[in-house]
C-alpha cells in the first residue's frame, strides 16, 4: 500500500527467512506506525512491536538459532565449539606444542593473546604483531582456526587478513567506535561481556556490530564483578539460558577468566555445557607455573584432555555435537 511504502522510506527494513515463515523487521522510529495498516494484508499473520532497543540481535526478529561459521568450524545450532590455548603467545615453540596437544584432545580452534590489555602498565603486554605471526604459524602446522583479541581499530585490516575469529575483550565491549569499525569486516566476532554489563548492554554492543554490517557475532560470558573477592569474577551461568531466550546468537563461556583458578575451570566448564552453552574457551598452558600471563587459571594439556572426555556425555545429554 502507499502507506506501507511511505513507512518503508522512513524505516530500515530487514528480512529474515525462516523454515516456516518470513519475518520483516522495521528498524527506526516505529512509534507512529499503525499496525492495522499491515494487518489488512492477507499475507501478514501478525504485527508486533518489539519493545527491546536491540532489534537485529533479538530472537523476535530471527526465531531460528544463528550458526556462525569460523573457517569451517560451526558455532551454534547444536555444535559445541571447543576453543583452547595459552593466555599469551610467548614463543612459536610454546604455541605450536600447545596447539598440537589441544587438537589431539578435541579442540577445534586455537586461542592466544598477541596483544594483551593488562590492568597494570608493568605487566606483560604481549608480543604484538610478532605474536600474530606465531599464531598463523600454529594454524599452518595444525589446521586450527585462530582466535585472538583486537584492541584497536588500527590493526583491523591485518586482523581481517590473518585472524579467523576476532575477539573483543570485556574492557572494549562498550568501545562503540571500535564496534562500529567491525562492520567493515565479515570475519566472525567473539564479543565478551563486560565485567559490569547488564544483559541489555551486552545485547546493544552486539547490535552495534550487526547494525554496522557484520552479522557474524558470537557472544561470550566470562564472569561479572560482584562483591565476592575470593574468585576473580563470578560466572553468571544464568546468562546462557537468558541469552538463548533474548537472542538468536550463539553464546560461549570462558570459565578460565571467570574463576581465575585452574581447579574451578573443570566444574564451571561442565556446568556451562549442561546449561546449554554453544562452546567453551579455555586457557591451556604446558607450564602454567612459568606462564607470563594468567598461569593460575590455565589447565595443563593432560587435564584439558581429561575434561573434554568427561564433557562428552554432558554434551550428548543436552543435544550438543562435539
Label the predicted regions.
Residues 2-7:
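Short, small-residue-biased leader/transition segments that mark boundaries at the very start
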Residues 52-83, 309-311, 316-322:
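N-terminal amphipathic alpha-helix/helix-capping segment at the start of soluble metabolic enzymes
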Residues 70, 185-284:
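Catalytic alpha/beta core domains of metabolic enzymes, predominantly
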Residues 79-97, 120-125, 145-149, 169-170, ...:
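Active-site mouth loops of central-metabolism enzymes
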Residues 80-86, 108-112, 146-148, 164-168, ...:
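Hydrophobic faces of well-ordered beta-strands that scaffold small-molecule active sites
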Residues 111-129, 286-298:
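Glycine-rich, proline-tolerant flexible connector loops at the mouths of alpha/beta enzymes
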Residues 124-148, 181-188, 237-252, 297-320:
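Alpha-helix-loop-beta-strand connector modules within alpha/beta enzyme cores
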Residues 127, 143-155, 164-175, 188-199, ...:
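Catalytic beta/alpha-barrel core
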Amino acid at each position: 500500500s502507499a502507506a506501507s511504502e511511505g513507512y518503508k522510506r522512513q524505516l530500515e527494513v530487514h528480512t529474515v527467512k525462516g523454515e516456516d515463515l518470513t519475518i520483516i523487521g522495521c528498524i527506526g522510529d516505529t512509534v507512529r506506525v499503525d499496525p492495522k495498516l499491515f494487518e489488512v494484508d492477507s499475507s501478514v499473520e501478525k504485527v508486533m512491536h518489539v519493545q527491546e532497543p536491540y532489534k537485529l540481535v533479538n530472537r523476535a526478529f530471527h526465531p531460528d538459532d544463528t550458526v556462525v561459521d569460523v573457517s569451517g568450524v560451526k558455532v551454534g545450532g547444536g555444535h559445541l565449539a571447543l576453543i583452547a590455548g595459552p593466555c599469551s603467545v610467548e614463543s612459536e615453540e610454546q604455541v605450536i606444542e600447545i596447539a598440537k596437544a589441544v587438537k589431539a584432545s578435541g579442540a577445534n580452534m586455537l586461542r592466544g593473546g598477541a596483544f594483551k590489555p593488562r590492568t597494570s602498565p608493568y605487566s606483560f603486554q604481549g608480543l604484538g604483531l610478532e605474536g600474530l605471526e606465531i599464531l598463523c604459524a600454529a594454524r599452518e602446522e595444525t589446521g586450527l582456526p585462530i582466535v585472538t583479541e583486537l584492541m584497536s581499530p588500527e590493526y583491523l585490516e591485518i586482523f581481517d587478513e590473518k585472524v579467523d575469529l576476532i575477539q573483543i575483550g570485556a574492557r572494549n565491549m562498550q568501545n562503540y567506535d571500535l564496534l562500529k569499525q567491525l562492520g567493515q569486516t565479515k570475519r566472525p566476532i567473539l564479543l565478551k561481556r563486560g565485567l559490569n554489563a547488564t544483559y541489555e548492554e551486552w545485547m546493544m554492543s552486539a547490535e552495534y556490530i550487526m547494525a554496522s554490517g557484520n552479522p557474524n557475532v558470537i557472544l561470550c560470558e566470562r564472569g561479572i564483578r560482584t562483591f565476592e573477592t575470593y574468585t576473580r569474577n563470578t560466572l553468571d551461568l544464568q546468562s546462557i539460558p537468558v541469552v538463548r531466550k533474548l537472542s538468536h546468537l550463539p553464546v560461549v563461556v570462558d570459565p578460565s577468566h571467570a574463576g581465575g583458578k585452574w581447579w574451578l575451570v573443570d566444574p564451571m566448564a561442565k556446568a556451562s555445557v549442561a546449561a546449554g552453552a554453544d562452546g567453551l574457551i579455555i586457557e591451556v598452558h604446558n607450564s602454567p607455573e612459568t606462564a607470563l600471563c594468567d598461569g593460575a587459571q590455565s589447565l595443563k594439556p593432560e587435564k584439558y584432555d581429561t575434561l573434554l572426555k568427561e564433557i562428552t556425555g554432558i554434551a550428548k545429554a543436552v543435544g550438543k555435537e562435539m
